[in-house]
Amino acid sequence: MRQIALVAFGGAVGSVLRHLVGLGAARLFGPAFPAGTLAVNLAGSFAMGLLVEVLARRFGGSPDLRLLLATGLLGGFTTFSSFTLDVAALAERGELGLAFIYLAASILLGLGALFAGLALARHLA
């Protein structure tokens, strides 16, 4: 039960943060491009890389922290289902070029952000 509570609490916080980032991105960039989803997925990828390395080095891979932060917080913060819906919406509006740019940017920059998080954690260790 404790593990479920850790995931639930982290997920609730992550979901609220995702919503706030989405609102802010819509105000800054407008609704034409899913900047909020891109931002949370890139930030989440970076944070996941940083977190995995820090947990391994400083906390011995603590299962409780991993459940709270990786599964809960970052699971609630990032969103693959919204990402795929955004790609489909752009494509269905006939904006295939923008859909491809968003798809490629999300995947490539997401991987880059993950590796940047790993590198930062290793540098700070």
Regions found by a protein language model. Give the residues of each.
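Membrane-interface helix-loop junctions in multi-pass transporters/channels
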Residues: 1-125
